[in-house]
Amino acid sequence: MAGSSYGNIFKVTTWGESHGKGLGVVVDGVPAGLELCEEDIQIFLNRRKPGQSKFTTPRKEDDTVEILSGVFEGKTTGTPVSMVVWNKNQKSKDYSEIASYYRPGHADFCFDEKYGFRDYRGGGRSSGRETIGRVAAGAIAVKMLSSLGIKFLTYTRSIGPVTINEVNFDAHEIYNNSLYMPDSDAAQKASEYLDECLKSLNSSGGVCECVITGLPVGLGDPVFEKIDANLAKAIMSIGAVKGFEIGDGFDAAKATGLTNNDAFIMMDGAVSKETNHSGGTLGGMTDGSPLIFRAAIKPTPSIAATQHTVNKSGEDIEISIKGRHDPIIVPRAVVVVEAMAAITIADALLMNMGARMDRITDFYKKL
């Protein structure tokens, strides 16, 4: 299977299946000298691990990370950083029935058609647990970028019909509720909505939003390495994501040039913008203002409600999916979205080092 790697210099390769022995990641291109320990990674993995509220799968996994290579005496060595999380609470018997039919909303049919074979236990490679490797790699990227003053604020913007009210936005509230919403009133309404979904054996989708501050001007390259294009690829590669928009996104299509353009102004002796309809990018490069994007996440496809499908013999059947599944993916996806954004920014930053001859000259003059 191709396609398990992402990035150019800061390159991430994930491996493992939901019900295999474990899952992990190899991260190439991590600069030497970054202080790093397993706790730095664990903090991020704890944000995505299951069993933390009634709105996540009851599958209990510690998701404890082990760093296998690339770190010595508390610092990265510049060699590949390899990490693993061992699976401990697989219940593969919950999935024995689905080997013979195709679950609506899942990749079962496509896997069978493409490869002629699939690991049906928990979705195998297409399981949400694949994101463990992404989050572990993203934790490294976030630590690397935070040392440069680049910060990430990622949260749940909406769940089903419930959207946060900008007037009530409180960043401190994000970690005060299990839905990671920066609006306590919206979080309460969303919880009530999800309770109804659970009662009706159904699930819900939602939207994650990410705001990145402290970015320099010029990350990303015009044409095929645009920062917004690479972010779109990174975010859309997350299994449940079905849409991506940056800045005003699709609303820009309803605007005029005069209302959509961000006027430039001088502020504190530097070029700035009056507004940020562009979401922090121009011409495929960061423009120094906050980079803002959103990811639309579909409802969990594994639901207990009766659904129509077909089996591998081509017969029409009805199914009710058993097992341990999230009624909503969004809260656990928040950190995955942040991780993929950080990986993309870290890669763009390292690629940017060779953009100008004067920077290369200045560097080598010091040697």
Curated annotation (Swiss-Prot):
GO terms for cellular component: cytosol. It comes from Agathobacter rectalis (strain ATCC 33656 / DSM 3377 / JCM 17463 / KCTC 5835 / VPI 0990) (Eubacterium rectale). Keywords: Amino-acid biosynthesis, Aromatic amino acid biosynthesis, FAD, Flavoprotein, FMN, Lyase, NADP. It comes from the Bacteria. FMN binds at R125, S126, S127, G283, K298, P299, T300, P301, S302, R324. NCBIfam families: aroC, PRK05382.1. Belongs to the chorismate synthase family. Homotetramer. CDD domains: Chorismate_synthase (cd07304). It catalyses: 5-O-(1-carboxyvinyl)-3-phosphoshikimate = chorismate + phosphate. PROSITE patterns: CHORISMATE_SYNTHASE_1 (PS00787), CHORISMATE_SYNTHASE_2 (PS00788). This is Chorismate synthase.
